Each structure stands twice: as C-alpha cells, then as structure tokens.
C-alpha cells in the first residue's frame, strides 16, 4: 500500500490571499480519496528543531521560528502574506518528508509527502516558496541515523530555478 503523508495545515497554513495555489493539497487529497488507488494517508509528526538544524543555519532557523525574518527575506521565500499557521505548516511538511523517508527505509519501500520537495531553500535563507530544504534535511538525517546509508544521490530536474 502506498503511504502518503498529508496534513490539512498544508492548505490552511498558507494565507488565502497568497498567490500560491494552496488549494492543490486539499483537491489532490479529495481526488485520491475518490479514486480506486490504495493509498494510506498518514498525518505527519511535527519535526523536532534539532532535525532542522542539521541542514540549516541556527540563526536563520530561529529567526523564522521566532517571527523575526526581515521583509526582504520573506519576499524571497514568497507565500505572502504569512498567516499565524506558517510555522507549524512548515514544521509539519518537514515532519512529513522525514516520515516518508523513515517509512521507506524501515519497511514500506514506497512513500511520499504531499507537500514535500521544498528544495529551493539554502543553508541560511529560504527561496522559491521553500523555507527549509526538506530534501537536504532528510538526506543528512538518513545518513546520520542509518549506518547502512552512506551515499545519497539527489537529481534536481526542476525547470524553473535550478538551485535545489
């Protein structure tokens, strides 16, 4: 069975005035619920702060969590205007990506996070609708926590930015 990590905050964690197409998560969930595909939806755990720090500058992470990013940093990320759910949304997305990786490694073989792929964030800044880089966090955590994982290959085929 295909495991898909999903949380409603993926949609409502983005302000309804944002130009980001936030409805795509709930619409995808609805379409999959109505399909014949055997999908198990799993609600992710919120990521621990220590797991974010393994791939991002602590000063940047703390500024985001404490709501002290400057307007220039927020504009570079996008998703504006931000609402009061953006921090939890971000942490649930990262938790969903980690959950999918752990599921694949430990048993299932196939899993995904509906809002994962936030790979345009850099070490000390966000970019392109990505606050933190879930791909980097997952790769670093997998190599740290699973001794049989020594190498990870990430291929970014995005057309739009090429900075993943």
Language model regions located:
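HDAC/HDAC-like amidohydrolase catalytic core signature
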Residues: 1-155, 159-164
């Amino acid at each position: 069975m295909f495991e898909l990590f999903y949380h409603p905050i993926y949609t409502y964690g983005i302000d309804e005035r944002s130009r980001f197409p936030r409805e795509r998560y709930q619409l995808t969930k609805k379409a999959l619920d109505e399909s014949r595909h055997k999908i198990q939806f799993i609600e992710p755990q919120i990521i621990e702060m220590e797991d974010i720090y393994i791939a991002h500058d602590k000063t940047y992470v703390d500024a985001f969590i404490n709501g002290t990013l400057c307007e220039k940093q927020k504009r570079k990320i996008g998703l504006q205007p931000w609402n009061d759910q953006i921090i939890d949304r971000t942490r649930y997305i990262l938790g969903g990506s980690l959950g999918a990786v752990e599921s694949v490694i430990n048993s299932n073989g196939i899993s995904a996070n509906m809002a994962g792929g936030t790979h345009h964030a850099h070490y000390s800044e966000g970019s392109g609708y990505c606050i933190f880089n879930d791909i980097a966090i997952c790769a670093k955590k997998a190599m740290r926590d699973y001794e049989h994982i020594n190498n990870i290959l990430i291929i970014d085929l995005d057309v739009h930015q090429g900075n993943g």
